[in-house]
Amino acid sequence: MKRILSVDDSASIRQMVGFTLRNAGYEVAEAVDGQDGLAKAEGSRFDLVITDLNMPNMDGLQLIEALRKQPGYTFVPILMLTTESQAEKKDAGRKAGATGWIVKPFSADQLIAVAKKLIK
C-alpha cells in the first residue's frame, strides 16, 4: 500500500485529506506542522508528502527544503496544499523542491487525481 504524509496545522484539513486518501486506498500519516512532519518523515518512508505552506514552528517551504536534504526524499513527490495562489509563492515552492501545488479549497476528486498522477 502506498503511504502518504499529510502535514497541516488545521485538524479539519488533515481529517479531510486523510479521509479522502484512505478511501482511495492509501495509507495516510498525519503531522501538525513542519517539525512534526520532518520527524515522522525521518522515521519512516512515504511515497508522497502533502504539506500546507503557512504553519507554526516550521512552514511548508522549510519542511520541503529539509526533506530534499534527506537521501530518501530526494525524488519523493511533495505537493503543496495551501490557500496561497500567488505566482511568487508558487515559484518559492518550486525552488524549495515542491513537485506540485493545489489551492484550497479543493475537491476530493482533484486531490485523488493528483495523488494518482504523482505516485507511480
Language model segments and positions:
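Charged docking surfaces used in two-component/phosphorelay signaling
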Residues: 15-23
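Short hydrophobic/Thr-rich beta-strand motif most characteristic of the beta2 strand and flanking loop
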Residues: 25-32, 40
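Active-site beta3 strand of CheY-like receiver
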Residues: 44-50
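Active-site residues of response regulator receiver
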Residues: 52, 82
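Receiver (REC) domain active-site loop signature in two-component systems and cognate sites
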Residues: 55
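C-terminal output helix
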Residues: 106-115
